Amino acid sequence: MSNTEQHQKKGQKNKVLLNNDIPFSKVFLIGEDGEKIGIKTKEEALDIARGEKKDLVLISVQPKPIARILDYGKFKYDRKKKEKEQKEKQTNINNRQIRLTPLIGDHDLLTKAKKTRELLLKGDRIKVSLKFKGREIARKELGIDTLNRFYEQVEDIAKIDKEPKLNQDRFLDMYLHPDKQKIAKYLKEKGEDNAKNEK
């Protein structure tokens, strides 16, 4: 299948069918307020929609054709608005990088872990990249141990997306993302501790 055909097929798949363009003789009709009206012929459903000065919109074909009475103009506007908000939300999620070395000292490791915690709590995803220098590459287990020690400092608010993997024979990379459930628990416990300290 050519790229043009694939694009056309995708466009047809995403096309919203409404009113006379609906290809089914019968549909399960849902009112604008979500009320289940029941099975109607397309003509009956169209008459009801026109009577309310609304559109008949096909919202599903599996396991049966389902159509809903809607103000299509408003429906289209709301859908575009929602898609835009989702896109903006995805854009706001930053991918940050934290660099480590196999022989990093405890103080430096804790400092970088603290910075990582701040980023995770903001919702950022983190790439932890450990760089081997010279003969250090022969001691891959040392790098794994360092990454494990680093993760121990953030595991109460994070999850590992991708386990440590060697890239370009020099970099041992691990990917982390914020864990919403863990963060909620952490913030709750932190709030309780603050309340105790204020007493």
UniProtKB/Swiss-Prot annotation:
Domain of life: Bacteria
Localization per record: Cytoplasm
Gene Ontology MF annotations: ribosome binding; translation initiation factor activity
Gene Ontology biological process: ribosome disassembly
GO cellular component: cytosol; membrane
Function per UniProt: IF-3 binds to the 30S ribosomal subunit and shifts the equilibrium between 70S ribosomes and their 50S and 30S subunits in favor of the free subunits, thus enhancing the availability of 30S subunits on which protein synthesis initiation begins.
Complexes and interactors: Monomer.
Protein family according to the UniProt entry: Belongs to the IF-3 family.
Protein name per UniProt: Translation initiation factor IF-3
